[in-house]
């Protein structure tokens, strides 16, 4: 029965296929292999898209949608792009999260019977970009696979991640708890995520394009073996991955997918890094956003810490900077080595110092990405010429580094890495033209002298006329026929023409080609050989050049690891030189590290804000076991958030390996940095501002340790005054008594300033400001002790709130203050022992205080709006009111 069904299905499929033209049958077969991908089908000088693909491409790429004929009764919708411009369209597609299969003609149209043979040669997806036209110079593109591990009860116990930068070949693995997935994805920022059905819902929204992959691709045993095969090792012990489970399953799925998109092996994936949470200072998504490391809160790339630090001379250095900022090591040893290298660069003599080194680095190509394209055999001619020129510049660069490296081991290590693989420079110099064409198909890529056959073909093509002149001269001398001519026409090709009176002198090797009335035309073996070459010389030269170029790529494959080593050394050297330039230009200093708990910053400055203003007020920050929490008060716009952020940024910069904006800085161990600064509704997640605020606070209270740095800004402001005050007090108390972390706690609840009376480890500081008339001048200086008021009305006035609103607010504020004084209900009771009040007293309403009419009148007026005569009249009015009491005024 099953056989009959199969036979019927095959017959139905054959009947359906017969309704299409042979070309459409070919297209539909290829499309069936890539159902979720836009198929770019090569037809002559265009890539065509058909049916639904054409409709989608026309919409996304703004192409003209046409309709030509029908296939199986269905109109064929078409859209196309020129083959020479396809990369720019692919770049647009991947930005939309789409993938494209590039289907090329691989058969010869002249010999093909039916449609020319076609094949998908590569698949372009958001996470597998390697072409320079599709990549941002200063950002990496990651393909990530996600595998959920389950315990015996079937409950998710861990999540394995594997992510690959295909352009460089860098592969990383990690295993983490399910609740850490969001933070990990926020840090990695993959362009594409591979997940099996059933695990896709684990991926937070907005984290990248999601591609469904068969569940069997994530098999752990198969993944482990595939990793070993890829790295050419017997086990993963040497990479620290022997204990991993779900991460190895993710790696297996990732390698299958990446190799399939490229249609070949991933020769440049030869190393593996297992990331452990304990290696780096923890930065949750909120902290990365609030500190504006690589992106502002508005979503722009500048001004950020990254944009300030990125004066790198190479794209490799810029990408490494981005990685370092998101991966600050916990161990201070790495940072100290970087500081030592920066110091050596700054102390070097001018002729061999920082400026000279950076000038040389500006001539360096993007070796990392060129190497990736080499490994995938997709490097273009100018990639190779850039690689050649870079390798040629390395000896001089190594000499400069060697002159500086005597006082810095890190520089010595980097200098040793700047040794091009043996034979590479010689091969590239001999093989590649000084200024090659952009594409191999254009010719002019292989250097003269590299291949005798190619040189001859080029000579034939370029110097055909000269060959004929030389041959004519030689044949006249050999035969003694003075009027012998060597010529060419399109009908008969090349020939030697001899007049009838001279035919008796024709040598035996002449073969008659054509007889004319007054002359005979001949061909010789030499001329025939030349003719065969000349008529196809250009075509054959291009084919020979293509073959030679492919041979050069193959010859470079064994040197991939050496090229990667050079790229890594260049990137780190460039970044350290950029750090040195920033330190010199912006007057930064080398921080110190200690094993003792504490943070000491002398005259610290916010690096990004300082670059935006003419003058920046530097401030000290001291946190230690006796001073674990700073309660920061002061007016809005007074600089509380800036002070808090600058403390975190200076600490982060120190551990990244940069010098810091301060007069001096000293840091104890730091394991994590938390921030609770600002908040907004999470509409997509159905969370209010206050819920977002409390969720972030809960994460801090649950995870902060005595080595964590916590920034809390106005916690509790998203709810009612007393609820917020109670929560802020309880949270501050918990941070002091349980977490015992370094804490900067900014608040407008002045009642909290009594906390140091209960906890000696807490201290009050404030951002100073002075009143000037009804205005305010922010001094931005951090001073000991609490602030005396918040200056809210003055800040509102600065913001442009209309004068009548300010006057009304002042009037109501005075009323509230008088009412509060009359009620005599001290707000500080929140921290004092509870006072027992008799029930009748609690039910008696307080007497309402009546403000003096003169004060009310003063609060109503705006001195800036008064004319001289009005002011005089008002003065008499106020004098009268002042002499009378409230009761008299009411009468």
From Swiss-Prot:
Q: Name one GO biological process term.
A: mismatch repair
The leader peptide range reads none
DNA damage listed as a keyword: yes
Q: Which residues bind ATP?
A: 634-641
Example of a GO cellular component annotation carried by this entry:
cytosol
GO molecular function per UniProt: ATP binding; ATP-dependent DNA damage sensor activity; damaged DNA binding; mismatched DNA binding
Q: Which UniProt keywords apply?
A: ATP-binding, DNA damage, DNA repair, DNA-binding, Nucleotide-binding
PROSITE patterns (alphabetical): DNA_MISMATCH_REPAIR_2
Q: Which family does it belong to?
A: Belongs to the DNA mismatch repair MutS family.
Q: What does this protein do?
A: This protein is involved in the repair of mismatches in DNA. It is possible that it carries out the mismatch recognition step. This protein has a weak ATPase activity.
Official protein name in the record: DNA mismatch repair protein MutS
Organism, scientific name: Burkholderia pseudomallei (strain 668)
Its organism's taxonomic lineage begins at:
Bacteria, Pseudomonadati, Pseudomonadota, Betaproteobacteria, Burkholderiales
């Amino acid at each position: 029965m099953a056989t009959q069904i199969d036979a019927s299905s095959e017959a139905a499929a054959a009947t359906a296929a017969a309704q299409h033209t042979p070309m459409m049958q070919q297209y539909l077969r290829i499309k069936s292999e890539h159902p979720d991908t836009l198929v770019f089908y090569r037809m002559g000088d265009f890539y065509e898209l058909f049916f639904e693909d054409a409709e989608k491409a026309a919409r996304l790429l703004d192409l003209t949608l046409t309709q030509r004929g029908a296939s199986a009764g269905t109109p064929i919708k078409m859209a196309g792009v020129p083959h020479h411009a396809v990369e720019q369209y692919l770049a647009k597609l991947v930005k939309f999260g789409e993938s494209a299969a590039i289907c090329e003609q691989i058969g010869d149209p002249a010999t093909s019977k039916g449609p020319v043979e076609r094949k998908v040669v590569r698949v372009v997806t958001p996470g597998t970009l390697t072409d320079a036209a599709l990549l941002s110079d200063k950002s990496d593109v990651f393909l990530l696979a996600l595998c959920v591990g389950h315990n015996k009860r079937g409950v998710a116990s861990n999540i394995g991640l594997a992510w690959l930068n295909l352009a460089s070949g860098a592969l990383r693995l990690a295993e983490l708890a399910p609740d850490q997935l969001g933070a990990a994805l926020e840090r990695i920022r993959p362009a594409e995520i591979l997940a099996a059905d059933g695990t896709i819902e684990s991926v937070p929204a907005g984290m990248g394009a999601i591609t469904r992959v068969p569940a069997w691709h994530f098999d752990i045993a198969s993944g482990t073996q595939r990793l070993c095969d890829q790295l050419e090792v017997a086990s993963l012990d040497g990479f620290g991955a022997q204990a991993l489970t779900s991460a190895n399953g993710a790696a297996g799925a990732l390698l299958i997918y990446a190799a399939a998109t490229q249609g070949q092996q991933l020769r440049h994936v030869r190393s593996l890094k297992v990331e452990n949470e304990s290696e780096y200072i923890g930065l949750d998504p909120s902290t990365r956003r609030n500190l504006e490391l690589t992106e502002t809160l508005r979503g722009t790339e500048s001004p950020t810490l990254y944009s300030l630090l990125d004066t790198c001379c190479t794209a490799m250095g810029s990408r490494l900077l981005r990685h370092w900022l998101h991966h600050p090591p916990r161990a201070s040893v790495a940072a100290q080595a970087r500081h030592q290298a920066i110091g050596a660069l700054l102390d070097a003599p001018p002729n061999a110092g920082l400026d000279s080194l950076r000038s040389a680095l500006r001539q360096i190509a993007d070796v990392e990405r060129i190497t990736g394209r080499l490994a995938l055999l997709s490097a273009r001619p100018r990639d190779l010429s850039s690689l050649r020129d870079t390798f040629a510049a390395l000896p001089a660069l190594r000499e400069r580094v060697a002159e500086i490296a005597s006082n810095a081991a890190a520089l010595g290590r980097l200098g040793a890495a700047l040794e091009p693989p043996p034979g590479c420079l010689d091969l590239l110099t001999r093989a590649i033209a000084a200024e090659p064409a952009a594409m191999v198909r254009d010719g002019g890529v292989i250097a003269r002298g590299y291949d005798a056959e190619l040189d001859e073909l080029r000579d034939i093509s370029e110097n055909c006329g000269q060959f004929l002149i030389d041959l004519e001269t030689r044949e006249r001398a050999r035969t003694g026929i003075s009027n012998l001519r060597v010529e060419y026409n399109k009908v008969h090709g090349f020939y030697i023409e001899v007049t009838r009176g001279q035919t008796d002198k024709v040598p035996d090797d002449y073969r008659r080609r054509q007889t004319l009335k007054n002359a005979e035309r001949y061909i010789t073996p030499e001329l025939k050989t030349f003719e065969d070459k000349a008529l196809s010389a250009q075509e054959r030269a291009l084919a020979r050049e293509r073959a030679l170029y492919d041979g050069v790529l193959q010859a470079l494959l064994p040197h991939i690891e050496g090229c990667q080593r050079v790229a890594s050394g260049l990137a780190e050297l460039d970044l350290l030189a950029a750090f040195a330039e920033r330190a010199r230009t912006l007057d930064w200093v080398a921080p110190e590290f200690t094993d003792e708990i504490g943070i000491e910053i002398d005259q610290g400055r916010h690096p990004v804000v300082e670059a935006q203003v003419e003058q920046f007020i530097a401030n000290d920050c001291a946190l230690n076991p006796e001073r674990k929490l700073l309660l920061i008060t002061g007016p809005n716009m007074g600089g509380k958030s800036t002070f808090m952020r600058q403390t975190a940024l200076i600490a982060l910069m120190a551990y990244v390996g940069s010098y810091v904006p301060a007069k001096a800085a000293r840091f104890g161990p730091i394991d994590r940095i938390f921030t609770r600064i600002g908040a907004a509704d999470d509409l997509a997640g159905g969370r209010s501002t206050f819920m977002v605020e409390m969720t972030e606070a809960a994460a801090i209270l649950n995870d902060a340790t005595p080595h964590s740095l916590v920034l809390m800004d106005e916690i509790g402001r998203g709810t009612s005054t007393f609820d917020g005050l109670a929560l802020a007090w309880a949270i501050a108390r918990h941070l002091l008594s349980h977490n015992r972390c370094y804490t900067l706690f900014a608040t407008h609840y002045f009642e909290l300033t009594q906390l140091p009376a209960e906890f000696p480890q807490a201290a009050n500081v404030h951002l100073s400001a002075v009143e000037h008339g009804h205005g305010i001048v922010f001094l931005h200086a951090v001073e000991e002790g609490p602030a005396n008021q918040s200056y809210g009305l003055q800040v509102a006035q600065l913001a442009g709130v209309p004068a009548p609103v300010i006057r009304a607010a002042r009037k109501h504020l005075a009323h509230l203050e008088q009412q509060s004084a009359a009620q005599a209900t001290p707000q500080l009771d929140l921290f004092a022992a509870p006072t027992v009040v008799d029930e009748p007293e609690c039910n008696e309403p307080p007497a309402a205080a009546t403000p003096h009419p003169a004060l009310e009148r003063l609060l109503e007026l705006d001195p800036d709006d008064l004319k001289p005569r009005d002011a005089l009249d008002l003065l008499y009015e106020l004098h009268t009111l002042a002499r009378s009491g409230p009761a008299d005024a009411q009468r």
